[in-house]
From Swiss-Prot:
The gene is Ndufaf1. It comes from Mus musculus. InterPro entries: Galactose-bd-like_sf (IPR008979), NADH-UbQ_OxRdtase-assoc_prot30 (IPR013857), NDUFAF1 (IPR039131). As part of the MCIA complex, involved in the assembly of the mitochondrial complex I. It is found in: Mitochondrion; Mitochondrion matrix. Residues 44-54 have a biased composition (Polar residues). Belongs to the CIA30 family. Part of the mitochondrial complex I assembly/MCIA complex that comprises at least the core subunits TMEM126B, NDUFAF1, ECSIT and ACAD9 and complement subunits such as COA1 and TMEM186. Interacts with ECSIT. Interacts with ACAD9. At early stages of complex I assembly, it is found in intermediate subcomplexes that contain different subunits including NDUFB6, NDUFA6, NDUFA9, NDUFS3, NDUFS7, ND1, ND2 and ND3. Interacts with TMEM70 and TMEM242. The modification Phosphoserine is found at residue 319. This is Complex I intermediate-associated protein 30, mitochondrial. Residues 55-69 have a biased composition (Basic and acidic residues).
Length: 328
Protein backbone atom coordinates (compact mmCIF):
# COMPACT_ATOMS: atom_id res chain seq x y z
CA UNK A 1 0.00 0.00 0.00
CA UNK A 2 1.32 3.38 -0.99
CA UNK A 3 1.88 6.09 1.61
CA UNK A 4 -0.06 9.37 1.38
CA UNK A 5 1.48 12.72 2.33
CA UNK A 6 -0.96 15.34 3.49
CA UNK A 7 0.30 18.95 3.58
CA UNK A 8 -1.11 21.65 5.85
CA UNK A 9 -1.94 23.83 2.85
CA UNK A 10 -4.68 21.49 1.79
CA UNK A 11 -2.72 19.80 -1.00
CA UNK A 12 -3.02 16.03 -1.21
CA UNK A 13 -0.09 14.34 -2.92
CA UNK A 14 0.42 10.72 -3.83
CA UNK A 15 4.03 9.77 -4.24
CA UNK A 16 3.35 8.04 -7.57
CA UNK A 17 0.60 10.04 -9.25
CA UNK A 18 -0.46 13.70 -9.27
CA UNK A 19 -3.48 15.05 -11.07
CA UNK A 20 -4.72 18.63 -10.45
CA UNK A 21 -8.41 19.34 -10.57
CA UNK A 22 -8.87 21.44 -13.67
CA UNK A 23 -12.41 22.46 -12.80
CA UNK A 24 -11.34 24.73 -9.94
CA UNK A 25 -10.18 28.27 -10.62
CA UNK A 26 -6.60 29.29 -9.83
CA UNK A 27 -7.48 31.28 -6.73
CA UNK A 28 -9.20 28.31 -5.02
CA UNK A 29 -5.91 26.45 -4.64
CA UNK A 30 -4.10 23.43 -6.03
CA UNK A 31 -5.62 20.08 -5.14
CA UNK A 32 -4.10 16.84 -6.33
CA UNK A 33 -6.20 13.65 -6.41
CA UNK A 34 -4.59 10.59 -4.96
CA UNK A 35 -5.04 7.13 -6.44
CA UNK A 36 -4.57 4.86 -3.49
CA UNK A 37 -6.03 1.47 -2.82
CA UNK A 38 -9.78 1.08 -2.53
CA UNK A 39 -9.47 0.07 1.07
CA UNK A 40 -8.22 3.57 2.02
CA UNK A 41 -10.80 5.50 0.05
CA UNK A 42 -13.98 6.68 1.71
CA UNK A 43 -17.18 5.38 0.20
CA UNK A 44 -19.18 8.18 -1.35
CA UNK A 45 -22.90 7.67 -1.92
CA UNK A 46 -24.88 9.24 -4.72
CA UNK A 47 -26.53 11.67 -2.29
CA UNK A 48 -23.17 12.87 -0.97
CA UNK A 49 -21.83 13.20 -4.50
CA UNK A 50 -24.81 15.34 -5.52
CA UNK A 51 -24.44 17.58 -2.47
CA UNK A 52 -20.70 18.04 -3.12
CA UNK A 53 -21.35 18.97 -6.75
CA UNK A 54 -23.97 21.49 -5.62
CA UNK A 55 -21.55 23.09 -3.16
CA UNK A 56 -18.87 23.27 -5.84
CA UNK A 57 -21.21 24.98 -8.28
CA UNK A 58 -22.32 27.46 -5.60
CA UNK A 59 -18.68 28.22 -4.76
CA UNK A 60 -17.83 28.81 -8.39
CA UNK A 61 -20.86 31.07 -8.81
CA UNK A 62 -19.80 33.04 -5.73
CA UNK A 63 -16.30 33.50 -7.14
CA UNK A 64 -17.76 34.57 -10.47
CA UNK A 65 -19.67 37.34 -8.71
CA UNK A 66 -16.47 38.55 -7.02
CA UNK A 67 -14.46 38.80 -10.21
CA UNK A 68 -13.63 42.38 -11.26
CA UNK A 69 -13.35 43.20 -14.91
CA UNK A 70 -10.34 45.41 -15.72
CA UNK A 71 -10.46 47.83 -18.59
CA UNK A 72 -7.18 47.08 -20.32
CA UNK A 73 -6.35 49.70 -22.93
CA UNK A 74 -6.32 48.42 -26.43
CA UNK A 75 -2.89 48.26 -28.05
CA UNK A 76 -4.34 50.01 -31.09
CA UNK A 77 -5.46 53.02 -29.05
CA UNK A 78 -2.83 55.74 -28.67
CA UNK A 79 -3.12 58.55 -26.10
CA UNK A 80 -4.12 61.84 -27.58
CA UNK A 81 -1.34 64.40 -27.14
CA UNK A 82 -1.80 67.94 -28.32
CA UNK A 83 1.57 69.65 -28.63
CA UNK A 84 -0.07 72.84 -29.83
CA UNK A 85 -2.17 73.05 -26.67
CA UNK A 86 0.85 72.34 -24.44
CA UNK A 87 2.93 75.04 -26.14
CA UNK A 88 0.03 77.49 -25.99
CA UNK A 89 -0.53 76.88 -22.27
CA UNK A 90 3.19 77.26 -21.56
CA UNK A 91 3.34 80.56 -23.48
CA UNK A 92 0.26 81.87 -21.66
CA UNK A 93 1.83 81.02 -18.30
CA UNK A 94 5.09 82.81 -19.16
CA UNK A 95 3.26 85.90 -20.41
CA UNK A 96 1.25 85.96 -17.19
CA UNK A 97 4.47 85.83 -15.16
CA UNK A 98 5.95 88.60 -17.32
CA UNK A 99 2.89 90.75 -16.66
CA UNK A 100 3.26 90.22 -12.90
CA UNK A 101 6.94 91.19 -13.09
CA UNK A 102 6.15 94.41 -14.98
CA UNK A 103 3.42 95.36 -12.51
CA UNK A 104 5.73 94.64 -9.57
CA UNK A 105 8.53 96.69 -11.14
CA UNK A 106 6.20 99.66 -11.63
CA UNK A 107 5.12 99.41 -8.02
CA UNK A 108 8.71 99.48 -6.76
CA UNK A 109 11.77 97.28 -6.15
CA UNK A 110 10.68 93.69 -5.50
CA UNK A 111 7.08 94.80 -5.87
CA UNK A 112 7.18 97.00 -2.75
CA UNK A 113 6.85 100.76 -2.37
CA UNK A 114 10.11 102.65 -2.86
CA UNK A 115 9.88 104.40 0.50
CA UNK A 116 9.59 101.07 2.31
CA UNK A 117 12.65 99.70 0.50
CA UNK A 118 14.76 102.79 1.25
CA UNK A 119 13.98 102.62 4.95
CA UNK A 120 14.73 98.90 5.11
CA UNK A 121 17.70 98.09 7.32
CA UNK A 122 17.59 94.29 7.19
CA UNK A 123 16.15 91.64 4.89
CA UNK A 124 15.74 87.88 5.22
CA UNK A 125 16.56 86.37 1.83
CA UNK A 126 16.33 82.66 2.65
CA UNK A 127 14.63 81.01 5.59
CA UNK A 128 13.61 77.44 6.28
CA UNK A 129 10.10 76.97 7.59
CA UNK A 130 8.69 74.31 5.25
CA UNK A 131 9.90 71.64 2.85
CA UNK A 132 9.28 73.87 -0.18
CA UNK A 133 12.13 76.10 1.04
CA UNK A 134 14.57 73.24 0.45
CA UNK A 135 13.72 73.22 -3.26
CA UNK A 136 15.60 76.51 -3.62
CA UNK A 137 18.90 74.76 -2.88
CA UNK A 138 21.19 72.18 -4.47
CA UNK A 139 23.57 69.88 -2.59
CA UNK A 140 26.58 68.31 -4.25
CA UNK A 141 29.82 66.56 -3.32
CA UNK A 142 32.86 64.90 -4.84
CA UNK A 143 30.72 61.81 -5.31
CA UNK A 144 29.82 63.22 -8.72
CA UNK A 145 33.45 62.76 -9.81
CA UNK A 146 33.99 59.39 -8.15
CA UNK A 147 34.67 60.48 -4.57
CA UNK A 148 33.18 59.05 -1.39
CA UNK A 149 31.79 62.15 0.32
CA UNK A 150 28.04 62.33 0.90
CA UNK A 151 25.81 65.26 1.76
CA UNK A 152 22.09 65.51 2.52
CA UNK A 153 19.65 68.32 3.23
CA UNK A 154 16.42 68.03 5.18
CA UNK A 155 14.20 69.93 7.57
CA UNK A 156 14.93 69.71 11.28
CA UNK A 157 12.61 67.93 13.69
CA UNK A 158 10.69 71.10 14.60
CA UNK A 159 10.50 72.29 10.95
CA UNK A 160 12.06 75.62 11.93
CA UNK A 161 15.48 75.20 10.31
CA UNK A 162 17.39 73.26 7.66
CA UNK A 163 19.82 70.50 8.58
CA UNK A 164 22.81 69.97 6.30
CA UNK A 165 24.65 66.77 7.17
CA UNK A 166 26.74 64.01 5.66
CA UNK A 167 30.18 62.41 5.65
CA UNK A 168 33.39 63.94 4.32
CA UNK A 169 36.02 61.69 2.76
CA UNK A 170 39.31 62.95 1.33
CA UNK A 171 40.06 59.66 -0.43
CA UNK A 172 40.66 60.50 -4.10
CA UNK A 173 38.66 58.68 -6.77
CA UNK A 174 40.33 55.67 -8.38
CA UNK A 175 40.47 57.14 -11.87
CA UNK A 176 44.24 57.37 -12.26
CA UNK A 177 44.10 61.15 -12.63
CA UNK A 178 42.75 62.79 -9.46
CA UNK A 179 45.18 63.16 -6.58
CA UNK A 180 42.99 64.90 -4.03
CA UNK A 181 39.33 65.09 -3.19
CA UNK A 182 36.94 65.69 -0.33
CA UNK A 183 34.35 68.45 -0.53
CA UNK A 184 30.64 68.96 0.11
CA UNK A 185 28.65 72.00 -0.93
CA UNK A 186 25.21 73.56 -0.68
CA UNK A 187 24.32 76.12 -3.38
CA UNK A 188 21.22 78.24 -3.86
CA UNK A 189 19.40 77.96 -7.15
CA UNK A 190 19.58 80.92 -9.52
CA UNK A 191 16.19 82.67 -9.53
CA UNK A 192 14.32 82.52 -12.81
CA UNK A 193 11.76 84.88 -14.29
CA UNK A 194 9.38 84.67 -17.21
CA UNK A 195 10.71 82.74 -20.22
CA UNK A 196 13.42 81.26 -17.95
CA UNK A 197 15.34 84.53 -17.70
CA UNK A 198 18.07 84.73 -15.10
CA UNK A 199 17.26 87.07 -12.25
CA UNK A 200 19.59 88.49 -9.61
CA UNK A 201 19.43 89.86 -6.09
CA UNK A 202 20.02 93.54 -5.39
CA UNK A 203 21.86 94.00 -2.09
CA UNK A 204 23.41 97.35 -2.93
CA UNK A 205 21.84 99.10 0.08
CA UNK A 206 23.30 96.58 2.55
CA UNK A 207 26.89 96.01 3.61
CA UNK A 208 26.86 92.83 5.73
CA UNK A 209 25.82 89.22 5.32
CA UNK A 210 23.85 87.93 8.31
CA UNK A 211 23.38 84.23 9.18
CA UNK A 212 22.03 82.31 12.14
CA UNK A 213 23.61 78.86 12.21
CA UNK A 214 24.56 76.03 14.53
CA UNK A 215 27.47 73.77 13.61
CA UNK A 216 29.92 71.19 14.91
CA UNK A 217 33.04 73.35 15.01
CA UNK A 218 34.10 72.88 11.39
CA UNK A 219 35.11 75.84 9.20
CA UNK A 220 32.99 76.53 6.14
CA UNK A 221 33.62 78.64 3.07
CA UNK A 222 30.86 81.08 2.13
CA UNK A 223 30.79 81.68 -1.63
CA UNK A 224 28.87 84.42 -3.44
CA UNK A 225 28.51 84.45 -7.20
CA UNK A 226 27.67 87.57 -9.14
CA UNK A 227 25.93 87.67 -12.50
CA UNK A 228 27.72 90.36 -14.48
CA UNK A 229 27.93 88.60 -17.83
CA UNK A 230 25.58 86.82 -20.19
CA UNK A 231 27.49 83.58 -19.60
CA UNK A 232 27.91 82.81 -15.91
CA UNK A 233 31.40 81.64 -15.00
CA UNK A 234 30.68 79.05 -12.36
CA UNK A 235 34.28 78.82 -11.12
CA UNK A 236 34.59 82.55 -10.37
CA UNK A 237 33.22 83.67 -7.03
CA UNK A 238 33.82 85.79 -3.95
CA UNK A 239 34.61 83.83 -0.80
CA UNK A 240 35.15 84.21 2.91
CA UNK A 241 35.43 81.89 5.90
CA UNK A 242 32.72 81.05 8.43
CA UNK A 243 33.84 79.38 11.66
CA UNK A 244 31.29 77.47 13.70
CA UNK A 245 31.73 77.06 17.44
CA UNK A 246 29.99 73.74 17.96
CA UNK A 247 27.73 72.89 20.84
CA UNK A 248 23.97 73.23 21.31
CA UNK A 249 23.76 77.02 21.04
CA UNK A 250 22.97 79.10 17.98
CA UNK A 251 25.45 81.66 16.74
CA UNK A 252 24.88 84.76 14.67
CA UNK A 253 27.46 85.23 11.94
CA UNK A 254 28.00 88.68 10.43
CA UNK A 255 30.39 88.97 7.49
CA UNK A 256 30.90 92.37 5.81
CA UNK A 257 30.81 92.21 2.03
CA UNK A 258 34.08 94.11 1.92
CA UNK A 259 35.85 91.05 3.37
CA UNK A 260 34.99 88.75 0.47
CA UNK A 261 37.96 88.07 -1.82
CA UNK A 262 37.87 87.08 -5.47
CA UNK A 263 38.81 83.49 -6.37
CA UNK A 264 38.82 81.33 -9.45
CA UNK A 265 38.73 77.52 -9.30
CA UNK A 266 39.51 77.62 -5.60
CA UNK A 267 42.57 79.87 -5.94
CA UNK A 268 42.80 83.43 -4.66
CA UNK A 269 43.53 85.76 -7.55
CA UNK A 270 46.18 88.47 -7.47
CA UNK A 271 43.82 90.99 -9.04
CA UNK A 272 41.09 91.80 -6.53
CA UNK A 273 38.02 93.97 -6.71
CA UNK A 274 34.92 94.66 -4.62
CA UNK A 275 31.81 92.56 -4.94
CA UNK A 276 29.08 93.98 -7.19
CA UNK A 277 26.11 93.85 -4.83
CA UNK A 278 23.33 94.69 -7.28
CA UNK A 279 24.00 91.58 -9.41
CA UNK A 280 24.10 88.71 -6.91
CA UNK A 281 23.34 85.40 -8.56
CA UNK A 282 23.63 82.80 -5.79
CA UNK A 283 25.25 81.95 -2.48
CA UNK A 284 26.80 78.69 -1.34
CA UNK A 285 28.55 76.92 1.53
CA UNK A 286 31.49 74.57 1.01
CA UNK A 287 33.17 72.19 3.44
CA UNK A 288 36.68 71.02 2.51
CA UNK A 289 38.82 70.95 5.65
CA UNK A 290 40.43 67.52 4.96
CA UNK A 291 39.00 66.10 8.20
CA UNK A 292 37.27 62.86 7.32
CA UNK A 293 34.12 61.96 9.18
CA UNK A 294 30.54 63.08 9.76
CA UNK A 295 29.51 66.73 9.82
CA UNK A 296 26.41 68.83 10.21
CA UNK A 297 25.35 72.44 9.84
CA UNK A 298 21.93 73.71 10.90
CA UNK A 299 20.74 76.95 9.29
CA UNK A 300 17.89 79.09 10.57
CA UNK A 301 17.97 81.92 8.03
CA UNK A 302 20.26 83.81 5.67
CA UNK A 303 19.85 87.54 5.26
CA UNK A 304 21.55 90.88 4.78
CA UNK A 305 21.55 94.06 6.84
CA UNK A 306 23.14 97.49 7.06
CA UNK A 307 25.75 97.99 9.78
CA UNK A 308 26.19 101.74 10.31
CA UNK A 309 29.46 101.16 12.16
CA UNK A 310 31.07 99.47 9.17
CA UNK A 311 32.41 101.99 6.64
CA UNK A 312 35.07 99.89 4.89
CA UNK A 313 34.63 99.62 1.12
CA UNK A 314 37.20 96.94 0.33
CA UNK A 315 39.62 95.16 2.65
CA UNK A 316 42.33 94.23 0.14
CA UNK A 317 44.90 96.33 -1.65
CA UNK A 318 45.56 96.44 -5.36
CA UNK A 319 48.76 97.26 -7.16
CA UNK A 320 48.82 99.40 -10.32
CA UNK A 321 51.05 96.73 -11.85
CA UNK A 322 48.53 93.97 -11.25
CA UNK A 323 45.36 95.94 -11.88
CA UNK A 324 46.11 99.16 -13.77
CA UNK A 325 42.45 99.79 -14.62
CA UNK A 326 41.70 100.78 -11.02
CA UNK A 327 44.41 103.48 -11.07
CA UNK A 328 43.54 105.29 -14.30
Amino acid sequence: MSSIHKLLTGIYIHKNFLRPRAALPPFVGNHCVDYSSSSLQKKVTSVDRASQQGKTEEGLQGHDHKEVALDAPSPDRTPEVSFDKAIRDEAIEHFRRLKDEIVAHLRGPDGRPLQEVIMEQARVVWQFREKEDLDKWIVTSDKTIGGRSEIFLKMSKNNRSALLYGTLSSEPPQDGDSRQSGYCAMISRIPRGAFERKLSYDWSQFNTLYLRVRGDGRPWMVNIRQDTEFIQRKNQMYSYFMFTRGGPYWQEVKIPFSKFFFSNQGRVRDVQGPLVLDKISSIGFTLSDKVDGPFFLEIDFIGVFTDPAHTEEFAYENSPVLNPRLFR
